[in-house]
Amino acid sequence: MKTKELNLESHPETGIKYDVGKLRFDLLPVKPLEAVAAIYTYGADKYADNNWRGGLTWGRVFGASMRHLWAFWRGEDVDSESGLPHLAHAAFGLLTLLEYQETHPELDDRIKDG
């Protein structure tokens, strides 16, 4: 990860904070993250809080994400069931798979060549 070095001379009137090399959460886009949070809220209302943490096979999550991506790619922006953006649904699935790599490797049902 590459970050800019702290330049103390450019802002001598402000306090010093050594944060070189730390994650820059301030760079994340707010509106898309709010859309993803709406998906988590929708899921909590439909199922239960943190239901997704219990684990699903990776293929089911991947399949759902792909359906939302294809719907978007065909020109449909909003999911008719939830009223929320297809891309936010897909992002939820991708974030879930990232989490499952650490928390649910036993549910990895990908077909592995070789």
Predicted segment positions?
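Intrinsically disordered, low-complexity regulatory regions
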Residues: 1-114
